[in-house]
C-alpha cells in the first residue's frame, strides 16, 4: 500500500491551465469560415445538447452527430484534423507550466479533468501538460464524484485543488472539508459569471491568474484553509 504523501496538488485543465475559451473561439471562426454561420450555429447547438446529455464537452462526438445530418459533405472529414492537430500548447495561460514546476517542489502534481476519452487526453498531451505532470492525468465524466478513486490513486494527508469552477470547488470542499485547500483562479467564462460568483461560497484562496500561484509558498496555501475555518 502506498504511503500517503504530505500534499498532492490537483489541477484542472480547461480555463485553469489552458485557455479553453480561446480554443472555442478559434473553432467557431473555423466553422464559420469553412461551412458558414448557419452550420457553425448548428454544430454548437448539437454540442450544447450533447454536453447536457453526457455531462462533459464532447467535441468529436458533436462532430459525428453533426455529420449524420449531411453525410455527403466530405469537408467534414477534415474537420476532425482541426481539432486533433490544434496547437494547444499555444493556448496555455502565461505561467501555467511554471506553476506546475513550482508546486512540484512540495508534492505530486496531478491533472484532474472532466472530458471524453479521446479528445481530452489529446488536448492535455499536445499542450505539454501531460509531460509536465509526468503522466499523472485523471479524466472522469464527473470528477467530483470520483474522490475515493482519486484518493486511492494518489493518497495524501492534504490536497490542494485548483479549478476555475466554484461549483466543483464547493462540492469537493463539502466532502473533504479541512483535508483540501480550494484555489480559484478567476479565468474563463465560468469564473467570471456573476451568477456563479454569488451562487457558491468563496474558495479558500482566490487568484486573478494561474501564474500568480508562483508567488505563493506552501505555508500560504495550507494556511488559506485554516484562515477560513472559523467562518464555515
Task: Indicate residue ranges for each PLM-predicted region.
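Short hydrophobic segments within beta-strands
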Residues: 12-13, 112, 162, 185
Amino acid at each position: 500500500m502506498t504511503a500517503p504523501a504530505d500534499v498532492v496538488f490537483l489541477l484542472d485543465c480547461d480555463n485553469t491551465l489552458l485557455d479553453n475559451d480561446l480554443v472555442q473561439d478559434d473553432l467557431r471562426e473555423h466553422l464559420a469560415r469553412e461551412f458558414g454561420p448557419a452550420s457553425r450555429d448548428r454544430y454548437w447547438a448539437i454540442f450544447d445538447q450533447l454536453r447536457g446529455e453526457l455531462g462533459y464537452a464532447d467535441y468529436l462526438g458533436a462532430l459525428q452527430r453533426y455529420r449524420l445530418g449531411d453525410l455527403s459533405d466530405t469537408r467534414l472529414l477534415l474537420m476532425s484534423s482541426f481539432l486533433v492537430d490544434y496547437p494547444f500548447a499555444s493556448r496555455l495561460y502565461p505561467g501555467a507550466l511554471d506553476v506546475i514546476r513550482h508546486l512540484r517542489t512540495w508534492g505530486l502534481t496531478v491533472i484532474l479533468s472532466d472530458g471524453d476519452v479521446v479528445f481530452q487526453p489529446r488536448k492535455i498531451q499536445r499542450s505539454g501538460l501531460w509531460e509536465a505532470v509526468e503522466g499523472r492525468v485523471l479524466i472522469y465524466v464527473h470528477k467530483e464524484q470520483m474522490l475515493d478513486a482519486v484518493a486511492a490513486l494518489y493518497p495524501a494527508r492534504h490536497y490542494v485543488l485548483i479549478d476555475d469552477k466554484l461549483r466543483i470547488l464547493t462540492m469537493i470542499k463539502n466532502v473533504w472539508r479541512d483535508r483540501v485547500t480550494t484555489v480559484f483562479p478567476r479565468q474563463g467564462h465560468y469564473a467570471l459569471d456573476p451568477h456563479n460568483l454569488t451562487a457558491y461560497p468563496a474558495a479558500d484562496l482566490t487568484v486573478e491568474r494561474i501564474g500568480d500561484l508562483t508567488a505563493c509558498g506552501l505555508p500560504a496555501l495550507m494556511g488559506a484553509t485554516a484562515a477560513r475555518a472559523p467562518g464555515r
